[in-house]
């Protein structure tokens, strides 16, 4: 008899708990809306605001700010301009050019991009996106992972500000 009572109490407890937790769900009102157009988010001219390097082989894993190699307060920092026809241009006065001479650009997936890909007659360059850029965002971060063989050795992080769009 006690076993039946324990089983009944346990079943009642389970039903009560499930009703309690199912009653706590908030109701969703409205619609989420259409996703942002990632291609439109890239349009415009972007100027370098920060450049950092992380040495993956160092036991400290520190990140060094090397912005001074590109930003000297006199010359215009590197600028990338992305056009609607999927072409891009690079303007650089000082520092090393990690982006080629210009060409065409794209994403690995236009709906859910992970990589920015730059195509030129000489090379194809691929950069990790540090976050997706929407049309109203004013900053963009991309990462270039330098490899030796199959192992990554450095991560260069470029942060840009939109100067027109």
Regions found by a protein language model. Name each.
Residues 2-11:
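Bacterial N-terminal signal peptides that target proteins for export
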Residues 20-23:
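C-terminal motif of bacterial Sec signal peptides marking the signal peptidase cleavage site
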Residues 25-100, 110-165:
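Lipid interaction determinants
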């Amino acid at each position: 008899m006690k076993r039946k009572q324990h089983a009944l109490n346990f079943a009642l407890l389970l039903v009560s708990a499930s009703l309690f937790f199912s009653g706590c769900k908030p109701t969703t009102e409205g619609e989420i809306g259409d996703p942002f157009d990632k291609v439109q988010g890239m349009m415009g001219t972007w100027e370098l605001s920060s450049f950092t390097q992380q040495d993956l082989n160092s036991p400290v894993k520190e990140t060094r700010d090397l912005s001074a190699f590109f930003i000297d307060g006199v010359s215009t920092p590197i600028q990338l301009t992305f056009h609607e026809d999927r072409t891009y241009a690079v303007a650089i006065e000082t520092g090393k050019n990690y982006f080629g001479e210009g060409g065409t650009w794209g994403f690995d997936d236009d709906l859910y991009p992970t990589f920015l890909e730059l195509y030129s007659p000489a090379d194809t360059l691929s950069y990790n996106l540090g976050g997706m850029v929407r049309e109203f965002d004013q900053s963009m971060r991309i990462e270039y992972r330098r490899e030796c063989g199959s192992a990554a050795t450095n991560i260069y992080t470029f942060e840009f500000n939109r100067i027109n769009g």
